C-alpha cells in the first residue's frame, strides 16, 4: 500500500493533468488561460513551500486576471505567504486588497483578526493593557464580520467573541 505522500503526489499530478485538459478545451480567452496557469503554478509552488516562486507566479496571474473572485483568491494566497513569512503588515494590506476584489471571503477577515489578536496577546504580555484592548477590539471587529459571512464555521472565534465580552450575539446569521 502506498504511503500518504505518494498518494498525495498522485492526486496532485492527476489533478494537474485534469486541470490542464480542461483549460485546453474551455472556451475562454488565452489571457484567462494564462492567468489560470500562473495561478495554478503559484499554488503548486506554495504547496511545496517555495514561497518566493509562488509569489512571482501569483503576481503574473494578477497582471492577466480580470475576474474579481479569482483575483481575490490569488491575493488571499499571497497574504497567506506574507503571514507565514512574518510580514504581518503586508499580509493585512494584501488581505484587504483581496476583500476589495471579493468581499465574501471570511477567511481573509479571520486571518486579519488572528494577526490583531496575536498583537493583543503580545501587548498583554508586555503589560500594555490599553494596546491589548485596542488590538483585541480590532480583532473582534473583523471576526464579527467573518462569522456573519460564515456562521458556524469559526466556532472558536464565536466562543472568543462571547467569552471576551466583545459580542452579545448568540447566533450569527
Curated annotation (Swiss-Prot):
Disulfide bonds: none
SMART domains reported in the protein's UniProt record: TPR (SM00028)
GO biological process terms held by the UniProt record: photosynthesis
Matching Pfam families: TPR_7 (PF13176), TPR_8 (PF13181)
Highest taxon of the lineage: Bacteria
Alphabetical list of PROSITE patterns matching this protein: TPR, TPR_REGION
Entry GO CC: plasma membrane-derived thylakoid membrane
Cited SUPFAM superfamilies: TPR-like
TPR repeat residue intervals: 35-68, 72-105, 120-153
Protein's membrane topology: Peripheral membrane protein
Cellular localization per UniProt: Cellular thylakoid membrane
Record has Signal as a keyword: no
Keywords assigned by UniProt, alphabetized: Membrane, Photosynthesis, Repeat, Thylakoid, TPR repeat
Primary subcellular site in the record, as a coarse category: membrane
Stretches that traverse the bilayer: none
Biological role: Essential for the assembly of the photosystem I (PSI) complex. May act as a chaperone-like factor to guide the assembly of the PSI subunits.
Family per similarity comment: Belongs to the Ycf3 family.
Record's protein name: Photosystem I assembly protein Ycf3
Organism encoding this protein: Prochlorococcus marinus (strain MIT 9515)
Name of the gene encoding the protein in the UniProt record: ycf3
Amino acid at each position: 500500500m502506498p504511503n500518504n505522500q505518494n498518494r498525495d503526489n498522485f492526486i496532485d499530478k492527476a489533478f494537474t493533468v485534469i486541470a490542464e485538459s480542461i483549460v485546453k478545451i474551455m472556451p475562454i480567452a488565452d489571457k484567462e488561460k494564462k492567468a489560470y496557469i500562473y495561478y495554478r503554478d503559484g499554488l503548486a509552488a506554495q504547496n511545496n513551500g517555495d514561497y518566493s516562486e509562488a509569489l512571482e507566479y501569483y503576481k503574473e496571474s494578477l497582471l492577466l486576471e480580470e475576474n474579481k473572485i479569482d483575483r481575490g483568491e490569488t491575493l488571499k494566497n499571497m497574504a497567506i505567504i506574507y503571514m507565514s513569512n512574518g510580514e504581518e503588515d503586508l499580509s493585512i494590506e494584501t488581505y484587504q486588497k483581496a476583500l476589495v476584489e471579493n468581499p465574501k471571503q471570511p477567511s481573509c477577515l479571520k486571518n486579519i483578526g488572528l494577526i490583531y489578536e496575536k498583537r493583543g496577546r503580545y501587548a498583554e504580555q508586555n503589560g500594555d493593557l490599553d494596546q491589548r484592548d485596542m488590538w483585541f477590539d480590532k480583532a473582534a471587529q473583523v471576526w464579527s464580520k467573518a462569522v456573519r459571512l460564515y456562521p458556524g464555521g469559526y466556532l472558536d472565534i464565536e466562543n472568543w467573541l462571547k467569552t471576551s465580552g466583545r459580542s452579545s450575539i448568540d447566533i450569527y446569521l
